[in-house]
Amino acid sequence: MKILKAGCFLINKQDKTVALVYRKQFDDYSFPKGHLEKSETLEDCAIRETAEETKRIAKIVKEFEPYINNYVTLTGKECSCYMYLAIDNGASDNKSKDTHPTYWIPFEQVEDKLTYQNLKDVWNSVKDKILSLIN
């Protein structure tokens, strides 16, 4: 059975920055994302996971289709991760304990900050859309 995940490219338009989370247990920088829960839409999952991991409210930009990253996990399971472009809409009151330190990275530095090549490839596939959104 395919694993479904969703997350956000969370953008601060005023500062032209992108939120990355630092996951201490993996010593990596990533976009906020996570597993789809039962009876949850992919958009709802992206918003919830972003709120849990960053304590920020994500407002999905409906004009852009999600980027779908298909891959196989280290344990051999197929996974599809739907990544939505979203604008930061302020602090969230989410009470999750799954929060990670969140860093607002200047647009030009995101690729260098990401830990894994597959995430750098994802970023390079969407950065022009994000640039059009923040300019």
Regions found by a protein language model. Name each.
Residues 1-31:
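N-terminal strand-loop-strand
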Residues 125-133:
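C-terminal alpha-helix
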Residues 66-67, 130:
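Short secondary-structure capping/turn micro-motifs that flank functional sites
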Residues 36-61, 67-122:
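Unchanged
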Residues 24-26, 31, 59-62, 109:
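Residue-level signal for pocket-adjacent positions within structured domains
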Residues 9, 121-124:
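RNase H-like, metal-dependent ribonuclease domains
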Residues 32, 38, 127:
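Functional cleft and adjacent loop/helix regions within the main domain
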